[in-house]
Regions:
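Extended amphipathic ligand-handling, pore-lining, and cofactor/metal-binding catalytic surfaces
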Residues: 1-161
Length: 161
């Protein structure tokens, strides 16, 4: 899908409205857990490329929108699992909800996030003393995200005309 959307992304990187759409979608999808006692943590893929800055941008926008119980980390880069655990420890949380910040919930979601082996996000949060719930679903399952992809695909097609 990246190649299809590349002409669009080359012109319109990190659109604030896209972030707002994603934030609205993920906060609505996890609203039942936002009880003040639960940290809601999203695990993105991450990359060493400059585009990794989207995770810090997402965290900043979540905070600016008042979602102080929401945290963003990555499997492959920064912020790391250790960074997220440190942030969560600053709060007085009893529970943690983990969800992938990925279009599809595949290997990283099932193993690195929700796996039962040492080193998984689930196990590391449990070791830190939290009751952990894993929501193994991709962002692509959320209707607002599907709509966003449709809009981007249409914009990419239109840019080729």
């Amino acid at each position: 899908y990246r190649r299809l959307l590349q002409p669009y992304f080359n012109r319109c990187r990190w659109k604030p409205d896209d972030f707002k759409t994603v934030i609205k979608a993920i906060t609505e999808a996890t609203a039942e857990y936002d009880d003040g006692e639960t940290a809601i943590c999203f695990m993105g893929h991450g990359t060493e490329a400059d585009s990794n800055a989207v995770y810090a941008k997402m965290q900043d926008m979540l905070a600016s929108e008042g979602y102080e119980h929401y945290y963003v980390g990555t499997v492959e880069a920064e912020p790391s699992l250790e960074d997220v655990i440190a942030k969560v420890k600053e709060g007085e949380y009893k529970k943690v909800v983990l969800e992938p910040l990925m279009i599809v919930a595949g290997d990283h979601a099932n193993n690195d996030m929700a796996g039962d082996e040492d080193g998984s996000w689930k196990k590391e949060f449990e070791k830190a003393g939290y009751d952990v719930t894993c929501l193994v679903r991709g962002l692509g399952e959320l209707e607002p995200i599907q709509q966003l992809f449709t809009e981007h695909a249409q914009a990419a097609i239109d840019s080729l005309k």
